[in-house]
Amino acid sequence: MYPPALTLLLTPGLVAAAIQPQAYASSADGRYKLSSYSAPVRGTGTPGSNSTWKLTIDDTPSGRKQTIKGFGAAVTDSTVSVFNALPSAQRTALLNTLMTTAGANFAMMRHTIASSDLSANPAYSYDDSNGQTDLSLSNFNLGGRGNAMASLLAEMRRLQPGLTILGSPWSPPGWMKLNRAIQGTTVNNNLDHAYASQFAQYFVKYLQAYQAKGATIDAITIQNEPLNSRAQMPTMYIYADEAGDLIQNNIGPALRNAGLDTKIWAYDHNTDQPSYPSTVLSRAGGYVPAVAWHCYASSLDWSVLTTFHNAHPGVEQYMTECWTSAKQPTPWNWAASFTMGPLQNWASGVTAWVLGTDTNDGPHLTGSDACDKCTGLVTVDAAAGTYNLRGDYYMMAQFSKFMKKGAVVMSGTGSWTYGDGSGLESVAATNADDGSRVVVIENKFGNEIYVTVEAKSGEVWSGLVYRNSVVTWVLPAAGA
């Protein structure tokens, strides 16, 4: 069966000045790590004895899809602590590698509002108030860990001025909940609506505190994984209609009245419950411009995002969490796949879980529910004063380094995965600044594939794609 064609659009009028075709690769065998690779050539080239694969790109206005906002990962307390444990020179080098064009050029970060499972003990919020009710939130305080988080995010924003920061809480202060606990029980693990106003003001105070430290937050979700209730980590259950009403009646107005333009994204959970964000939009659509998805559905299907887009074409979508692990190894292309799939289905950005951990996948809370196998894109050996960029980092950088913020994803066909997991997946975009066209190709075969890309404008590009690798082609503007 011959795979369908990939389509791509170039925005008219953009001129790519002296852009030469380039290619970069990251491979399963570690031979390539965001490394320069044989560039594609004009024409059909010479495939020799290599297997071939044909893609087509439609570089006309009909192919325009979503605009890229950025790629990155979750900044947790673990990330902050291990990055800050590095010697100054190493820390500076790492942040430049992550946040600038010298490295991954990450332009989106999701951070944890107070404690998550990837926090050292004890779990905390920004207004614990010794467990006592604090109606005026007079005891609100970022504390040492919150201040350290805000400082790191501010530093990231200075390095990447176009950075989009999303904040997500794992739990509000325990006194706001029916069970009066951040963690420890799943009984009555819900918001006490007697404190709905304080819940909304908690977000206001958090946003103002971070803004004062130079870490302006662009968007929030009101609860990480609102359908996940666990005893041994911070969680809180929020029903879909409840979430919509809280946003419409409390949180949205509170942010507006405080003069904050922070956006509220719906859901922040798995793709198997698309009715949840639909319900939120029906009840609070005026405050909700975007939906956030996670990758943990038992039967993961990113086409859910396309179906959702067709029902809600004006709503942005993001893939905001998918774990990476070394202790429970995921496939070599795991991070590439959880970036590729959402992009093919209308996602404007992707963030992995998690940006940084130590070499033991922590620090993390104790208890069976906390993730003790979540490994950062970066691991830090504090004793040695060194860091390691893991394979998942390179897989995500194959997208983030070349598909710049503002790039437009193009409609396409041509991607195909067989039942045994082999195949070739691709997504393409046009950069807004120079008109360069970026085609990311994920080769899931154990052999090299000679790929030919035919453009509707008349161009043909071809080149070899390394086995079990992700290769990014950077092509000049059409007609250049």
From Swiss-Prot:
Its main location: secreted. The keyword Flavoprotein does not apply. InterPro entries: Glyco_hydro_30, Glyco_hydro_30_TIM-barrel, Glyco_hydro_b, Glycoside_hydrolase_SF. Keywords: Glycoprotein, Glycosidase, Hydrolase, Secreted, Signal. The keyword Glycoprotein applies. It is an enzyme of class 3 (hydrolase). This is Endo-1,6-beta-D-glucanase. It comes from Neurospora crassa (strain ATCC 24698 / 74-OR23-1A / CBS 708.71 / DSM 1257 / FGSC 987). The lineage of its organism: Eukaryota, Fungi, Dikarya, Ascomycota, Pezizomycotina.
